Amino acid sequence: MSMAVYNNQEGEEGNPFAGALTEFSQWLWSRPLGNPGAEDAEEEAIAAQEELEFPEDEAQARHSCLQRTTSWATPKEVSPSGRVYQTVRHSRMEYSRPTMSIRSQASYFSSSARPLPPPPVPSLMSWTPIAKYHPSSPTSTSSKFLRAAPKLIKRG
């Protein structure tokens, strides 16, 4: 069993799903994984964070990821490998500049009889070109250029 929840948002105001996803993510992350009474339970936790700054645009990008995997022994009837693996991950990316703020977050939960390869975590380097500022102000054209007659270019 695995489940992934994604939420892309530009500002959280007016987004009815923003609060629900945040609550679900907090519940999922705080949820005890594994079999609390198992003596041979193994747990692995990973926390990663990266930041980029774009001084020319006065912009910042941040990515944080928390992942926890727990495994424990189980009868062969339940799992052919003899272990059960549960993984929970929460990933959050933010991009902000003076005129805009974008947030994206994803939560992931899986339970399996064998360790699953980790789902790809979006890299900040691949995400920021999408959000990076590109000047979009309308071009201003002086009226003297509009009145000038077009020049004819002769090619020999």
Swiss-Prot record:
Region (RNA-binding): 57-156
Listed Pfam families: Luteo_Vpg (PF01659)
Alphabetical UniProt keywords: Host cell junction, Host Golgi apparatus, Host membrane, Host mitochondrion, Host mitochondrion outer membrane, Membrane, Phosphoprotein, Transport, Viral movement protein
Highest taxon, organism lineage: Viruses
GO cellular component, as recorded: host cell Golgi apparatus; host cell mitochondrial outer membrane; host cell plasmodesma; membrane
Membership in a protein family: Belongs to the polerovirus movement protein family.
Function, in words: Together with movement protein P3a, facilitates long-distance movement of virions in host. Transports viral genome to neighboring plant cells directly through plasmosdesmata, without any budding. The movement protein allows efficient cell to cell propagation, by bypassing the host cell wall barrier. Binds ssRNA.
Protein known as: Movement protein P17
